[in-house]
Design a protein with these regions (language model features):
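Transmembrane and membrane-interface helices of multi-pass
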Residues: 2-154
């Protein structure tokens, strides 16, 4: 009984550590597609972006009910956005901005004029993202997750 309780507490601590560290890693990896975030992003901007990624991770956790699933979703979103942004920066030297959503048809029509071959840097960062997604397999599932309507009320 006591050993079971200790294992449960250990799993909760590991999940909490993952909920704190993985979103920060996702931010830095996403930024690594286009530049070195530690030297080119101001400290306060790094802090607020990491807080934003933490907030997204916790929201996903409350919606999904599983740490592993929430963090995997966040890693996939960060990877896709980072790759998309890297190609946009490569082609027009400006990052993705919200109003780019309105010009997606134009982007699709001229996409055949560009070379989408990834460079070594993109491949390495993508492999690191995929390794992070795979390593989350070792985070134990929660026993007895709360249904979504109960999570939203709490």
């Amino acid at each position: 009984m006591k050993i079971e309780w200790i294992k449960e507490q250990k799993n909760k601590i590991i999940q909490l550590l993952c909920l704190v560290s993985v979103p920060a890693a996702a931010f830095y990896l996403m930024e690594c597609y286009t530049h070195n975030p530690l030297s080119e992003v101001r400290t306060w901007a790094q802090l607020f972006n990491v807080i934003l990624f933490e907030l997204i991770a916790w929201i996903l956790y409350f919606l999904v009910g599983r740490v592993r699933t929430a963090l995997r979703i966040e890693l996939v979103i960060a990877m896709v956005f980072g790759l998309s942004n890297a190609y946009v920066v490569r082609f027009r030297t400006n990052p993705i901005v919200p109003w780019d959503l309105f010009s997606w048809k134009t982007a699709a029509s001229v996409a055949s004029n560009y070379d989408f071959k990834p460079d070594t840097h993109m491949v390495v960062v993508t492999i690191l993202f995929l390794a992070g997604i795979a390593l989350l397999q070792f985070v134990k599932k929660e026993s007895g997750t709360i249904k979504i309507w109960k999570r939203l009320i709490l």
